[in-house]
């Protein structure tokens, strides 16, 4: 079969292994790295990958051939935890952060999430759409081709739905594919202060059924943290969401360990997020339950904390992990996944292969798109990130610089040398 598109002579092509499950523990050390590699694309899907000169059968009279000496290729990068859609910004809290005021104290003062809730409730659909689209453009320019996006800055039905509607519209309109997560349980809204269980009952009885009926989200998430929602409250919401057919996520062990990882393991959550203060016992439970750890080192960096998620312990225990931005206006105002990948090396001591597996094949499993993206297996969508680097180590070693040369989405060139095509 001849290719429509043949990308040749890469210095290296990074090929994650899709073993039919996320890469656990030692498996994350493994990948195929093709020297002088090529990628053949047919009808927007991967036809073949290999080293050296492509087989003559791949080349026809209409095959477009492009050479990439001095470049590397990876599957399109996947940002599997973001809070993409929100109103306003929170630079006015920055001085407090620099002065050492804890995040939970800022939240208790009506800042943090609640500040963004007010701004998001006031924002129109068009305002949220335009702002989120600009963020997606930035992500695309940095090699990202799929993004998970949460609601959670409305905390009422009208605004939560508006956020999810924006995600749906951008999924249709933008080159990046989006995966939607419903997270009305991101905080207790001011009007329910002191009545968190009552608010969760509102979510369960009124919001979740409408989200499911209107097919607005695939996942349900909750913030299990001291001063927000307890482990029992998280178990209540997520068990109800599971009964309705949602896949589960949980923000857990970010600031204090209060049992969120136990809930993740008990309910078979797809992923647990943050895990900066995860305990050895919690790690063991998540490994046994095959819960993916979505790790967010840029959040630790932004909060000016010293405690990064214990990624090496997780791998030694046999967990699967990803790296992702947590892009949001407060605790992690960035949309640069390449920087997060570099933090994974510098601050978590992950290897380049482990990092690249984390943002490709494991991230694909985290967003339930493993059959479509995350590796260069034949038949998967031809999402390809091409970096201006001589080997796979270089973009992790040479930090704080966007090395994206080109991006292909489903076989279509969408980024070329710093601009969206």
Swiss-Prot record:
CDD domains: Imidazolone-5PH
GO BP field: L-histidine catabolic process to glutamate and formamide; L-histidine catabolic process to glutamate and formate
Its EC number(s): 3.5.2.7
Chief site of localization: cytoplasm
Residues annotated for N-formimidoyl-L-glutamate binding in this entry: 153, 328, 330
One annotated Gene Ontology cellular component of this protein: cytoplasm
Cell location: Cytoplasm
Bound cofactor: record note: Binds 1 zinc or iron ion per subunit.
UniProt-annotated binding residues for 4-imidazolone-5-propanoate: 90, 153, 186, 254, 331
Gene Ontology MF term list: imidazolonepropionase activity; iron ion binding; zinc ion binding
Amino acids binding Zn(2+): 81, 83, 251, 326
Coiled coil stretches, renumbered: none
Cofactor(s) named in the record: Zn(2+); Fe(3+)
Catalytic activity: 4-imidazolone-5-propanoate + H2O = N-formimidoyl-L-glutamate
Keyword terms, alphabetized: Cytoplasm, Histidine metabolism, Hydrolase, Iron, Metal-binding, Zinc
Positions contributing to Fe(3+) binding: 81, 83, 251, 326
A Pfam family matched in the record: Amidohydro_1
Alphabetical list of PANTHER family matching this protein: IMIDAZOLONEPROPIONASE, IMIDAZOLONEPROPIONASE-RELATED
Protein family (similarity comment): Belongs to the metallo-dependent hydrolases superfamily. HutI family.
Name of the protein described by the UniProt record: Imidazolonepropionase
Organism: Streptococcus sanguinis (strain SK36)
């Amino acid at each position: 079969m001849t290719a429509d598109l043949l990308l040749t002579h890469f210095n290296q092509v990074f090929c994650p292994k899709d073993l039919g499950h996320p890469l656990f523990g030692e498996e994350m050390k493994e990948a195929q790295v093709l020297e002088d590699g090529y990628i053949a694309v047919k009808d927007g899907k991967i036809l073949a990958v290999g080293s050296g000169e492509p087989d003559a059968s791949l080349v026809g009279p209409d095959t477009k051939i492009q050479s990439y000496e001095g470049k590397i290729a990876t599957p399109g990068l996947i940002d599997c935890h973001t809070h993409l859609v929100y109103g306003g910004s929170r630079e006015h809290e920055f001085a407090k952060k620099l002065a050492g005021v804890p995040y939970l104290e800022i939240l208790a003062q009506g800042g943090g999430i609640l500040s963004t809730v007010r701004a998001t409730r006031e924002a129109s659909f068009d305002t949220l759409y335009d702002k989120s689209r600009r963020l997606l453009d930035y992500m695309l320019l940095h090699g990202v081709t799929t993004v998970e996006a949460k609601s959670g800055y409305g905390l009422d039905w009208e605004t939560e739905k508006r956020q999810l509607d924006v995600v749906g519209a951008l999924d249709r309109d933008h080159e990046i594919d989006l995966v939607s997560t419903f997270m009305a349980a991101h905080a207790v809204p001011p009007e329910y202060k002191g009545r968190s269980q009552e608010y969760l009952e509102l979510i369960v009885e009124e919001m979740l059924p409408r989200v499911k009926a209107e097919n607005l989200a695939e996942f349900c998430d909750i913030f299990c943290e001291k001063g927000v929602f307890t482990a029992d409250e998280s178990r209540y919401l997520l068990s109800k969401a599971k009964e309705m057919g949602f896949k589960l996520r949980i923000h857990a062990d970010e600031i204090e360990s209060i049992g969120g990882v136990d809930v993740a393991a008990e309910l078979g959550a797809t992923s647990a997020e943050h895990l900066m203060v995860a305990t050895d016992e919690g790690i063991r439970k998540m490994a046994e339950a095959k819960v993916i750890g979505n790790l967010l080192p840029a959040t630790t960096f932004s909060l000016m904390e010293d405690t990064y998620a214990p990624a090496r312990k997780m791998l030694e225990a046999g967990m699967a992990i990803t790296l992702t931005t947590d892009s949001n206006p407060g605790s992690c105002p960035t949309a640069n996944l390449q920087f997060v990948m570099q933090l994974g090396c510098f601050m978590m001591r992950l290897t380049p292969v482990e990092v690249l597996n984390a943002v490709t094949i494991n991230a694909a499993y985290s967003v339930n798109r493993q059959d479509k993206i995350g590796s260069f297996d034949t038949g998967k969508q031809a999402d390809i990130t091409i970096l201006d680097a001589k080997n796979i180590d270089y973009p992790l070693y040479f930090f704080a610089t966007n090395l994206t040369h080109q991006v292909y989405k489903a076989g279509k060139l969408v980024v070329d040398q710093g601009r969206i095509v």
